[in-house]
Amino acid sequence: MPSNICSVSRALCLRKGAVSTLNDWMIIIFLTLIPGIAMPIGASFAGLERIRPRWFESEVRHSVIAFGGGALLAAVALVLVPEGVKNLDPLLIAVCFMSGAAAFLLLDVLLAAKATPASQLVAMLSDFVPEALALGATFAVSKASGVLLAGIIALQNLPEGFNACGEVTSSTHYRVSQVVGAFTLMALLGPIAGLTGYFVLSDFSELVSAISLFAAGGILYLIFQDIAPQAKLEKHWAPPLGAVAGFLLGVMGKVAVGA
């Protein structure tokens, strides 16, 4: 009889563990799909410019760009760097961080030389995919930090989608609907990267930290190379408040989830 009880107990524990893993699997898909869907949502807002041009004065557009920069900075300061420095020594921290910046620099040079419509799509993926990988791996260790990172990625992807769609449609023959469709397909990469981070990388804490710092270094380069210069508008002082708002929302999210 005791052996039967032990067998039943082990079976229940295994079943509970399987259910927990399945629930985490579904949550990660949701957490990575929402930030991905934010890209086509932001792109669809760019299409409203043709309907109501007065809504999209230059000050509003620059404020939206600045908001995305603030959200990106929040991701670096509140999630990626704190998670990244946990498991690495100072030398590796510096190497991973600067490697991310160097990789984004090389990508920026390559995209500038090519100057193709796909450049904007590649630029968006270059920070979205590493962040989704880090999200999945982080969720395995701290669910609160994973939720926070998902929210911050969504905040940054809305203005990124908006800005990228505007640039693509203005320089090519592609319509807003076509760009929105492309961004929607890109959103599916989020769950793939997130699940990879959760099931493959979560057991390698040093590698997760390295990826987080790599993404942080690249994003910081991106902020000051591309986003901050676009946010500045001569004789207008309100757009930088968008960056403050983006960062503040990241801070409030951190407070709310207790990460």
Regions picked out by a protein language model, each given a short descriptive name:
Residues 2-259:
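Intrinsically disordered, metal-sensing/regulatory segments
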